[in-house]
Amino acid sequence: MKVRHLLPALLVCATVSAQSNPRARALGVPFDGASGPLDAITDVKGVEVGDTTLIRGEGKLIVGQGPVRTGVTVIFPRGRADGEPVYAGWFSQNGNGEMTGTTWVEESGFLEGPVAITNTHSVGLVRDSIIAWLVENGRFTQQPWSLPVVAETWDGYLNDINGFHVQKADVFSALNTAKPGPVPEGNVGGGTGMVCYGFKGGDGTASRVLPADAGGYTVGVLVQCNCGRRPQLTIAGVPIGKLIPAAPANAMLEPEWKGDVGSIIIVVATDAPLLPGQLKRLARRATMGLARTGSSSGNSSGDIFLAFSTANRGANKEPGPNSVLTVSNERISPLFQATVEATEEAIVNAMVAAQTMTGVDGHTIQALPHEKLAEDMKRSPQVLPR
């Protein structure tokens, strides 16, 4: 995780959070399915993730100065050093949001270059910065243009979103530090200033590994969650949002806006050999994982999902024709199930990792309380051994 422009105390807090926060399973949340060794999108071989986190200032909002609570997260499907396209598909559950480059994903069936997630008003800057990075790194050898996929959620409750604090150097930093291995969660990258179900949200990840008789494939998910209202929050079937007591009087647990106005971006990666149409089907299943946590994808929510496969190298090789492999539709259902399960867990992991944050005008969003969550998991009759 790359953190820029931080107060020293906040830098220490953010670094410790990324390294030592427990994850949902450690608190007794009984998720379905078998995870990979990292329980992260990087369990899909080749996938690399980088981020830049911007935290500075406090007190009254001064547009252009702060407080700043934002950043950018990037995902390389085949790693930073490998720009070969991958098969991909996307789906919009509710379209009050943005994911650039998806018309070409839909048309071509390919995802080219890194995926980035940031705040709503930084999409253009991040998109242009990715192109500049590709130019600088000599990636335009096969074609003289790029249509990067950049998605967003709104962090304006905690962040000076109209101050445009994400800069080209921040995007380059996230791109240049992307790596395999554990993925930071919570108040990091594009998820720094996000709110989820009235609690602190952010970035989260999880994975599932299919049994050998189902192909042994891996499915990994990364989310940037900024959606839902507190009473909706459901974890492992338990109505957690209704069980947790009100926040202290000096804190705001539920933002002052009404309705389900947040958003969530979900990126699904797999090493299963799937065609673009099948990957669109996989992206649609992320909706069910989201629904498990309580969301109904309200009118003002931007719930947009992308799925890609790292299999089938050389599928776009010139001049062709090219031969590719594909999982039979009759055997694709376990991949659907894995996507649902990993999406649910990634959202909860984001909330468990996130820490209480105070941003513009003293707005405070409380973290999901770990002890209360663990207690409710133990006591709830809905929680069965899995």
Predicted regions and their residues:
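Alpha/propeptide regions of enzymes that mature by internal proteolysis
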Residues: 19-386
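Bacterial N-terminal signal peptides that target proteins for export
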Residues: 1-7
